[in-house]
A protein has these predicted regions:
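Glycine-rich phosphate-binding loops that contact phosphosugars or nucleotide phosphates
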Residues: 1-111, 117-123
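A short, charged, Gly/Pro-tolerant segment at domain boundaries
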Residues: 126-147
Length: 147
C-alpha cells in the first residue's frame, strides 16, 4: 500500500485490515524518505494499491511508476479527475465525495476500502483463518489488560 501525506490514512487502514486476512501485506511508509529501501524487492506478480488525491504528490507517482516498471500491478485509487495519475497505474479507480470543506471527504474511499477487504476476505477464507489464528496467538501473550 502506498499513500503519502494526506493519503497515508486510507493506505494505512487498508494495510492494517488487509494484513489480518492476507500474508505479505506491506505499507510503504517512507519515514525519513526511505522509499528506495522499502521497495527494493518489488517484483513481477506483486500488487500495489496507491492512494493519490489532489494535490497530487509527485513522489507518489514516481514510486508507482518504479513499481510498475519492475512488473508489479499498480491500482490507483484517486479522485474524479484521473488524468494526472492515469499513466502510472494498471487500474485506476475514481472515488470521490465532495465535502463541505476545501478538501474532498474520504468517506467514499473508506467505503471502497471496506468493500475491497470484504471481497478479498470472501475469496481467501482459508488464508484469512490462518493469519487471524497467528495474530490471536501473538495477542494472547499478555497484550491486553483484564482479558
Amino acid at each position: 500500500m502506498l499513500g503519502l501525506r494526506t493519503c497515508f490514512s486510507p493506505a494505512f487502514y487498508l494495510a492494517v485490515v488487509l494484513s489480518e486476512i492476507k500474508k505479505k501485506v506491506r505499507l510503504i511508509q517512507g519515514i525519513a524518505s526511505t522509499y528506495p529501501e522499502e521497495i527494493t524487492d518489488v517484483e513481477e506478480g506483486d500488487v500495489c494499491t496507491v492512494f493519490s488525491f489532489p494535490r497530487f504528490y509527485k513522489e507518489t507517482v514516481n514510486i508507482a511508476h518504479f513499481m510498475r516498471r519492475r512488473g508489479a500491478k499498480v491500482i490507483i485509487i484517486t479522485g474524479k479527475d484521473i488524468r494526472p495519475v492515469k499513466p502510472y497505474g494498471d487500474i485506476i479507480i475514481p472515488c470521490s465525495a465532495v465535502g463541505p470543506s476545501f478538501k474532498d471527504s474520504y468517506v467514499a474511499v473508506h467505503f471502497l476500502i471496506d468493500y475491497i477487504i470484504s471481497s478479498i476476505a470472501a475469496k481467501n477464507k482459508d488464508e484469512g483463518i490462518e493469519v487471524v489464528s497467528k495474530i490471536e496467538e501473538i495477542l494472547s501473550q499478555n497484550y491486553f489488560i483484564g482479558f
